Amino acid sequence: MGQEPRTLPPSPNWYCARCSDAVPGGLFGFAARTSVFLVRVGPGAGESPGTPPFRVIGELVGHTERVSGFTFSHHPGQYNLCATSSDDGTVKIWDVETKTVVTEHALHQHTISTLHWSPRVKDLIVSGDEKGVVFCYWFNRNDSQHLFIEPRTIFCLTCSPHHEDLVAIGYKDGIVVIIDISKKGEVIHRLRGHDDEIHSIAWCPLPGEDCLSINQEETSEEAEITNGNAVAQAPVTKGCYLATGSKDQTIRIWSCSRGRGVMILKLPFLKRRGGGIDPTVKERLWLTLHWPSNQPTQLVSSCFGGELLQWDLTQSWRRKYTLFSASSEGQNHSRIVFNLCPLQTEDDKQLLLSTSMDRDVKCWDIATLECSWTLPSLGGFAYSLAFSSVDIGSLAIGVGDGMIRVWNTLSIKNNYDVKNFWQGVKSKVTALCWHPTKEGCLAFGTDDGKVGLYDTYSNKPPQISSTYHKKTVYTLAWGPPVPPMSLGGEGDRPSLALYSCGGEGIVLQHNPWKLSGEAFDINKLIRDTNSIKYKLPVHTEISWKADGKIMALGNEDGSIEIFQIPNLKLICTIQQHHKLVNTISWHHEHGSQPELSYLMASGSNNAVIYVHNLKTVIESSPESPVTITEPYRTLSGHTAKITSVAWSPHHDGRLVSASYDGTAQVWDALREEPLCNFRGHRGRLLCVAWSPLDPDCIYSGADDFCVHKWLTSMQDHSRPPQGKKSIELEKKRLSQPKAKPKKKKKPTLRTPVKLESIDGNEEESMKENSGPVENGVSDQEGEEQAREPELPCGLAPAVSREPVICTPVSSGFEKSKVTINNKVILLKKEPPKEKPETLIKKRKARSLLPLSTSLDHRSKEELHQDCLVLATAKHSRELNEDVSADVEERFHLGLFTDRATLYRMIDIEGKGHLENGHPELFHQLMLWKGDLKGVLQTAAERGELTDNLVAMAPAAGYHVWLWAVEAFAKQLCFQDQYVKAASHLLSIHKVYEAVELLKSNHFYREAIAIAKARLRPEDPVLKDLYLSWGTVLERDGHYAVAAKCYLGATCAYDAAKVLAKKGDAASLRTAAELAAIVGEDELSASLALRCAQELLLANNWVGAQEALQLHESLQGQRLVFCLLELLSRHLEEKQLSEGKSSSSYHTWNTGTEGPFVERVTAVWKSIFSLDTPEQYQEAFQKLQNIKYPSATNNTPAKQLLLHICHDLTLAVLSQQMASWDEAVQALLRAVVRSYDSGSFTIMQEVYSAFLPDGCDHLRDKLGDHQSPATPAFKSLEAFFLYGRLYEFWWSLSRPCPNSSVWVRAGHRTLSVEPSQQLDTASTEETDPETSQPEPNRPSELDLRLTEEGERMLSTFKELFSEKHASLQNSQRTVAEVQETLAEMIRQHQKSQLCKSTANGPDKNEPEVEAEQPLCSSQSQCKEEKNEPLSLPELTKRLTEANQRMAKFPESIKAWPFPDVLECCLVLLLIRSHFPGCLAQEMQQQAQELLQKYGNTKTYRRHCQTFCM
């Protein structure tokens, strides 16, 4: 694949009449989501011959909702202008060259459905909305015209290419009208014939109706197509043909001169190879048209399944059509086509571009009707990226539209060679992982918990694991099988198992040979192997080291656990992150240094990336787990959560990270330096992957539906953009809602809150739940809710154009609101009458027998008749049919006749109560009958059980009462009265059911109260309640209450861990104390140390010591913190610290006199009772096992001082034990640490405090014998002299400044690049005057320099170590060769890029200009190096340097040594100022060293200056 950025853009929007367009010259644009993407097509677009000539060149960003229409200006000279319409209610005019908005309007009050730029008027844009309103907008004069033609939904409109005032409009119901905008939208023709949506309108490219020989004698159906009856028709001069495409499966050709249809083309059903016709195909039909300007007798249309047809209009009686790409299988779209637009390239080639539901943009050659190229696109978030280690260049992309893409990034013929895999997926693809050794085997995970395997080289559906995760699959990883899968024989089990981590916190091990079998939860193995009794943390990430021996698990609490095969023994826990771990990545194993493979990078919901070096832990394999609280490297710069990290396979220690801040950052992890920052995405980055072949190429995916291929060498920024930290934003979000619950209690605020939730989040969630469907809803994924805080403040009013007015619930004394024309008017209500409560109480109760009562209030005649009927019924011996009918008709007489009639009256009265909504009265009547069981059954069926009915249920029997209580409990659950339902279940002794009911509905507090009161203390249900509630509280951030739950469940370890999640000093101290109380000593010690480190950052020395005092094993750390406090006070008194602060120091009586070491030991003796050699030895052993990473220039000052004081503490302890070898090594580690960090001042203070009289004292203690510390002592003495050398030099050049900032900056400059300080040496040496002392320097100083200077200069001879000079020269040679190789690769890539971008027309001159700097830079590089830049020569130099380095003894290589050549240059520079001060022997030795070992780029120029 060429060296040029690439983009997989979002899918073009669906179901829009005009969402893509193109202009002559090769510029094509299409609307995707809220943006418009621009594609350059034709010669010059491809970067090299033979590649598809198209390239995504930009994006128009400005709309806040879906873009519903897009059109270019087709007027010469205006091809750079285009117009867009959006669901946000605006129409914008853009300049595509600057990608900015020229002007816009928001005239529409309803959703805009389509727009078109008039081909006849340069500044006219016509748009229509779903309510039938048309706006004509002339942007040059900022004028507009409002037209309301029909009260129907507009689907499409097209301006006439022949008459500037004519516009054809298609409606949803099939009506087509032609209007004249110059006559206020007068309807010229109303064309009837279609009976469904009009999808497309195309004017004939030629005026008049003589271009087509259409038979005027049409079918009877054609004869019925006439003009509207009530509209006066105005014939159009010369007339013109118009084509319309409709959902009714027909294309109609209309005559504008006669206002009637002249031709009908019915879409054919085209059978696909190997399949039948889908019966629902009509429901998915979209019929779009294109009438070619150079072929007016041809018409192009879409068809049912994505095929394109070219109709021959000259043979209308035969309905002849030609199928696009008829000879090639698989070239057509696989689903319906939405838009067609023509494009004429710079070489006059006629192309046709189509967008489809299959998410492909295809380009067709009109001459051959064959597909020229395809641009794939994405219909969802790009969740995951994975390169295959077997099929190099195959990039798998997991997308939220339910499809997996496999991009062959090495394809020569097609730069966008992408295959889609969708069978069996049916959900968002959130995780991907290629098999390390099996070709084409791709594992995938989805957001519904599915795990499967795809064979990308076959058409078979994927294998799906029978074990699903309960939530989203976060990560997939291939690793060696562990028990029980690994217990089988060699041929009975796979060599690699598939591990999946789900959102519920479980890691499953799947057997790829038998996915139908049950997957194993590795938590069980972890518990058994490590004898863990506490609750395991929720896992969020899994990563295997490349050698398959170590597994890392990231957890929700921010911890990372390191396990060792075969039984997953826990060897290490990293307590660094404080939030959920999102990503873990191990360094590759083919680096130049083997120890780099032990580097592990991790990112979490915090914005900081930590790199840990686990070499010591893995190689030692400790018996008990080690806790790591200090990172090897810290990479700070992102401002939001880290979602993905990936190591470069081409470099040592180079890392790329993706973040929610919208950028991808490349780091030099070893030096903690940001290198370059990519800002091409428009959303939050979700994944990133380094190209396996190109060291300059990185791929990244985001929630903007894009995957970008970008080059590190082309980025303008080096670090992420500045912004508010995510921690600050989180604090604001947590602090704002605290007052809201109080407001919600007011009844007047309930209605607005509910409306807001329905309009916002619930609508998004409904879209999300709709899943991957075919109507384009999946383009708006639910995760976009999280982006709301990132949008501009002015966005919210634009989204909701009409304010929602919520009427509050008002009381009798409140004023009611009346809305008139969006204005709120307050109307006063009349004051209520006095004593309303008294009136309510006097209200008469509702009658139980209202029907019979009303019948007793009829007329006198009817009442008399009742009496006669009643008498006849009571006293007649035999009732005839007439009397029975009269009694039955007069049911109210049941009160006076027999029981059967009374029952009938009660039934009728009861039905009346039910119909009127008074079930309680019906129940009373049924109780009067004595049918209590029937009442209960009826009330239960209707959900109308009450407390009274349930209370009376025992009268119907014990079993009836049990049944009634259960039915009432179910009814209460439907009414969300769970607590009351649980109380009723308790009344029938169903305690477990009541507890489960409350637990399942998150009433944990009530459930625990019931369980604690009614169940046995050892009942497992109670513990499960505590753990479930604790998990919920922990997830919501209520750590203290969660800790109580874990304590209640006797999970004290988990209680301490959850308390520590907050990360502040108070929480850590409480957690440490809790762990100490419950006997978790190791956890208590680690938490106490973390607490002390937090207090150290706040300069709270007293609190830090109190925290360390919690655990006896931290005695050594107390000594370190004590020494650190004394040293910090010492530096502050000297004003050497970075700034004075109100530090809470201890009131230790140390005094200011005496050596610093004696003061330290005095405090240790008085405060910590440290006096005997045994105590010193014990403290030394505790501290010796703690290893800190080496320092860099970016190491924070507090952390640097802590690490230095740790080494100094070991040195002091060694001195007290008379172990001088250990003392020397510890002192040297402290000095080297300050040297590596560039803190020259700290290094000098270490010497002044611990070696005030130099190294002679240590030399005497070591003696003359050769000990293991002898090389270390020589290095320590050399660094001491190195510092004295610079102090001596600065004292000569000017009075020594007091500012430590200047001193430190000067040292850093020299230690990195001595040439920057020595550039003036050549000029100073050639001029004799400059060699003399400064004129204003006093003569006494000259005498002092002469007497004392020579004696001091003679001591600097110890710095002239030829062994170290040779070693350092070899190291510089290796570094320079590696840098030169990297530069060669970069230059080659740039040259290729220059050539590719200069292939277009009129770019020959820029190509030459682009090549000239490259050639000049290369020649300049050759001049500086005086050697050819050939690969064999570089390889030879690298081999020789490595061989020389291998010959040096380990004692020389083990301990750092000051740069020998740098010291030589400083001494020679001093000589240039003071010629007589340096002995001839030293001068000659320095020059010889420079001549012999100064052949590298760093020192070559200065060697020529001083050695001539």
From Swiss-Prot:
<keyword id="KW-0694">RNA-binding</keyword>
<feature type="repeat" description="WD 6">
    <location>
        <begin position="333"/>
        <end position="374"/>
    </location>
</feature>
<feature type="repeat" description="WD 3">
    <location>
        <begin position="150"/>
        <end position="189"/>
    </location>
</feature>
<feature type="modified residue" description="Phosphoserine">
    <location>
        <position position="847"/>
    </location>
</feature>
<keyword id="KW-1017">Isopeptide bond</keyword>
<feature type="coiled-coil region">
    <location>
        <begin position="1362"/>
        <end position="1393"/>
    </location>
</feature>
<feature type="site" description="Interaction with U4 snRNA and with the 7-methylguanosine cap of RNA molecules">
    <location>
        <position position="641"/>
    </location>
</feature>
<dbReference type="InterPro" id="IPR056421">
    <property type="entry name" value="TPR_GEMI5"/>
</dbReference>
<feature type="site" description="Interaction with U4 snRNA">
    <location>
        <position position="335"/>
    </location>
</feature>
<feature type="repeat" description="WD 13">
    <location>
        <begin position="680"/>
        <end position="720"/>
    </location>
</feature>
<feature type="region of interest" description="Interaction with U4 snRNA">
    <location>
        <begin position="13"/>
        <end position="15"/>
    </location>
</feature>
<feature type="repeat" description="WD 1">
    <location>
        <begin position="62"/>
        <end position="104"/>
    </location>
</feature>
<keyword id="KW-0225">Disease variant</keyword>
<feature type="cross-link" description="Glycyl lysine isopeptide (Lys-Gly) (interchain with G-Cter in SUMO2)">
    <location>
        <position position="754"/>
    </location>
</feature>
<feature type="site" description="Interaction with U4 snRNA">
    <location>
        <position position="556"/>
    </location>
</feature>
<keyword id="KW-0597">Phosphoprotein</keyword>
<dbReference type="GO" id="GO:0017069">
    <property type="term" value="F:snRNA binding"/>
</dbReference>
<dbReference type="GO" id="GO:0003730">
    <property type="term" value="F:mRNA 3'-UTR binding"/>
</dbReference>
<feature type="site" description="Interaction with U4 snRNA">
    <location>
        <position position="579"/>
    </location>
</feature>
<feature type="repeat" description="WD 7">
    <location>
        <begin position="377"/>
        <end position="417"/>
    </location>
</feature>
<feature type="modified residue" description="Phosphoserine">
    <location>
        <position position="757"/>
    </location>
</feature>
<keyword id="KW-0175">Coiled coil</keyword>
<keyword id="KW-0648">Protein biosynthesis</keyword>
<dbReference type="GO" id="GO:0030621">
    <property type="term" value="F:U4 snRNA binding"/>
</dbReference>
<feature type="site" description="Interaction with U4 snRNA">
    <location>
        <position position="470"/>
    </location>
</feature>
<dbReference type="GO" id="GO:0043022">
    <property type="term" value="F:ribosome binding"/>
</dbReference>
<feature type="repeat" description="WD 8">
    <location>
        <begin position="424"/>
        <end position="464"/>
    </location>
</feature>
<dbReference type="InterPro" id="IPR056432">
    <property type="entry name" value="Beta-prop_GEMI5_1st"/>
</dbReference>
<feature type="compositionally biased region" description="Basic residues">
    <location>
        <begin position="739"/>
        <end position="748"/>
    </location>
</feature>
<dbReference type="Pfam" id="PF23774">
    <property type="entry name" value="TPR_GEMI5"/>
</dbReference>
<feature type="modified residue" description="Phosphoserine">
    <location>
        <position position="778"/>
    </location>
</feature>
<dbReference type="InterPro" id="IPR011047">
    <property type="entry name" value="Quinoprotein_ADH-like_sf"/>
</dbReference>
<dbReference type="GO" id="GO:0034719">
    <property type="term" value="C:SMN-Sm protein complex"/>
</dbReference>
<dbReference type="Pfam" id="PF00400">
    <property type="entry name" value="WD40"/>
</dbReference>
<feature type="modified residue" description="Phosphoserine">
    <location>
        <position position="770"/>
    </location>
</feature>
<dbReference type="GO" id="GO:0000398">
    <property type="term" value="P:mRNA splicing, via spliceosome"/>
</dbReference>
<feature type="region of interest" description="Disordered">
    <location>
        <begin position="715"/>
        <end position="790"/>
    </location>
</feature>
<feature type="repeat" description="WD 10">
    <location>
        <begin position="533"/>
        <end position="573"/>
    </location>
</feature>
<feature type="modified residue" description="Phosphothreonine">
    <location>
        <position position="751"/>
    </location>
</feature>
<feature type="region of interest" description="Important for interaction with U1 snRNA">
    <location>
        <begin position="1"/>
        <end position="124"/>
    </location>
</feature>
<comment type="similarity">
    <text>Belongs to the WD repeat gemin-5 family.</text>
</comment>
<dbReference type="GO" id="GO:0000387">
    <property type="term" value="P:spliceosomal snRNP assembly"/>
</dbReference>
